[in-house]
Amino acid sequence: MIKNSFISVIPQEEKEENKGSVEFQVFSFTNKIRRLTSHLELHKKDFLSQRGLRKILGKRQRLLTYLLKKNRVRYKKLIGQLDIREPKIH
């Protein structure tokens, strides 16, 4: 698998400064999710990776919910940049 094929939305300078920002964390989780998804397409019975994927999806969802409550503009921009579907909010 090619690691460089993943998206680079956040410029390199910002990555060095802002590793704790919500946007960077969501970006990082999204790359991990895409990597695990492609892995699971080849290895359908890798249940530990499936569990890890579900945990990462939950973490990303909680961060996105937090960002939605705090700053809707940044949320919409991030969703658009990362090409993530907007979840149903209960």
Curated annotation (Swiss-Prot):
Subcellular location as annotated: Plastid, Chloroplast
Gene Ontology BP, a term: translation
The keyword Cell membrane appears for this protein: no
GO MF annotations, alphabetized: structural constituent of ribosome
Listed InterPro entries: Ribosomal_uS15, Ribosomal_uS15_bac-type, uS15_NS1_RNA-bd_sf
Cited HAMAP family: Ribosomal_uS15_B
Subunit structure of this chain's protein: Part of the 30S ribosomal subunit.
Annotated protein name in UniProt: Small ribosomal subunit protein uS15c
Species name: Dioscorea elephantipes
